[in-house]
């Protein structure tokens, strides 16, 4: 009897072991089947998240692009209106205090009075008496140490855009080959010079090439035959320089050499 009990116990243990093994296998199978749905759900969530990020990036890029387009369109309009409004207020401020003392507080009267005053000054300075007064005033200004430099610079700018062709500083717009071969510089013809050091006299054009500002630049003497004259007026050339070349037309065509210059060259 004592020997049968260990045998029975061993048999029970073997039976329990056989019963436990399938149970463990089935548990492993259940774990594998349950891991598949979890992995598929994580993959679907990651794909949904990536699509959401792509959509958000697209919306943000589209919105920023449209916003910058609106800024590009509205910025020059806003700057133009702001400068115009500031200029009207600035000019109106010269005579509006006089009207305010008289009890007239109508906006625009000072501006109209300033415009009329500028027109009358132009009419007066065009006469012989006005020119004499202007020369006398310039004589005093040019003897002031610091003021004369400011006056000369501002006068050069105003003379450059003067409608009087006789006193206009910039005669024509010019394009010259400078500083190296294959490169061109944009400038203005200010005068013509005849060089007599050579066996045959050579006509040179004095070309002013602005560097940073309109009143700062280099003066180059270029043969008149090497000067390219585009179909641009002086005002258009000044706009190109002030805008940093952004207002340059896409296509430029050249014009013929002025007849006066040709006749002068042939007479030499």
Swiss-Prot record:
Mostly expressed in flowers and stems, and, to a lower extent, in roots and leaves. Residues 21-48 are annotated as: Disordered. It comes from Arabidopsis thaliana (Mouse-ear cress). Belongs to the plant COV1 protein family. Residues 92-103 are extracellular. GO terms for cellular component: Golgi apparatus; membrane. This is Protein CONTINUOUS VASCULAR RING 1. The chain crosses the membrane at residues 71-91, 104-124. Keywords: Developmental protein, Membrane, Transmembrane, Transmembrane helix. One of its GO terms (biological process) is stem vascular tissue pattern formation. Residues 1-70, 125-268 are cytoplasmic.
